[in-house]
Amino acid sequence: MDFFSLNKIIKPNQKFTSNEAEFLQIATDYLEESQNYLQKGLKQLKKEYKRSIIYNPNLEYKRFVKWKENFTETFESYYDRFFITKYNHYSLSLLFSFINEQIETVIASYNSFLNEHNKLAFNKVSFSFEKKLFEATQQFNNLEKNTAISDDLPLQFKVRTTQLKAQRERELKNLLNKIKLKNLSEKKQEILLNNWFNSNERLFLKNEVKKVNWLNSPRQKQQAAQIDDQNIIELKNVYKYITNGITTNAVLKGVDLAIKSHDFIVILGPSGSGKTTLLNIISGMDRASSGSVIVNGYNMICLNDRKLTKFRQKYVGYIFQQYGLLPNLTVRENIEIGANLQPDPSKRISIDALLEAVGMDSLQKKLPNELSGGQQQRVSIARAFAKNPLLIFGDEPTGALDLEMTQIVLKQFLAIKKRYQTTMIIVTHNNLIANLADLVIYVADGKIKSLHRNLNPKQVEEIHWI
């Protein structure tokens, strides 16, 4: 069976369009073409390996379909992201690149599955007990690699994990003896093996869910930590696990990181790499499952939800990817909400100056539903700036902005950082923004793959943006 490739998905050679309706149609057609290709590929895998456990490809395909539905429903809010004001047209190259990030994740899971099965040294027969056993064993090995670990875990969870492994091995030994002693049909062998796998997988995951739920609750430890004069943020061996109540997944895996005060930090990485989770943990939007997270002297893993909220109110400004504006308040009132979170009036940044800087002064009486996605993003940015917090975090803060406004906003980022000595940390897919950063963090597969410190960060006008 051939490997899958992005190049096999048909897309137009057209690079841009000035027609909004045509842009929407091209996007819709490409999304449908992509889903059809991925759906057909998944069916081929299931047909070719019908007796295999096609776990990751199936999971990634479902994730893509859900993302596509959400993207299609909110497509209008993304217009500014792909519109090049200077040339007055929509960039199809930017559109395809954005969609392809999601497609490539699914294709990678398909090809990884193919590659793994091509290496299996078993002959193709209608049913091979040895092959099926190997696959089931490999699946348990993969589950155990993803098991939740922490020195904080109560002994009962560790004991239960050991007991389940011993039980699984004991039941498998009994199953093999039964098959050896009795002349069972291939169908009966397959049923017995599937029952063994499903039963033990269910018990394993049930225990993992309990572990993750415990790890994601606040710890009973000293909340204050020694403040580092140089590093405002320090992470040591940080893990983050998530669960939907049925399965679990490690999103961050053993992250170590130190961030200096007053730096501008850019976090890069592919979709699903864990970069937004990392941002949420260091900003107090979420708690780590294990490890040490010290932010401005606070031991974040020990703070309950109420104390995390107080921490954010006191120290943090956050620019959300989906804007997070209050729908019944005007542009100005939304920004005032941010300013009023700063208890020291002398530290607040002028709302009038911010409105002018982000080009929203003439729209300050408008409600969010009267604004485009890019305009709402500008309000979200101004709201975070108005508070003049110690730390500013942004999840794709320029993602909905056109090229011209992106440059204006980034200049504001750097100006506020310089004037108020603010520490700024943003997640972005735009690699060019990394040229402005003091430190660039590249995240992949839940780990920090590289750290790069720019000794001479560039200014916005020094970057070739097109």
From Swiss-Prot:
InterPro entries for this protein: AAA+_ATPase, ABC_transporter-like_ATP-bd, ABC_transporter-like_CS, MacB-like_ATP-bd, P-loop_NTPase
Superkingdom of the organism of origin: Bacteria
Record: residues binding ATP: 269-276
Stored SMART domains: AAA (SM00382)
Residue ranges annotated for the ABC transporter domain, each copy included: 233-463
SUPFAM superfamilies, per the entry: P-loop containing nucleoside triphosphate hydrolases
UniProt-listed CDD domains: ABC_MJ0796_LolCDE_FtsE
Keyword Transport assigned: yes
Pfam family, one: ABC_tran
GO molecular function: ATP binding; ATP hydrolysis activity
Protein name: Putative ABC transporter ATP-binding protein MG065
Organism for this UniProt entry: Mycoplasma genitalium (strain ATCC 33530 / DSM 19775 / NCTC 10195 / G37) (Mycoplasmoides genitalium)
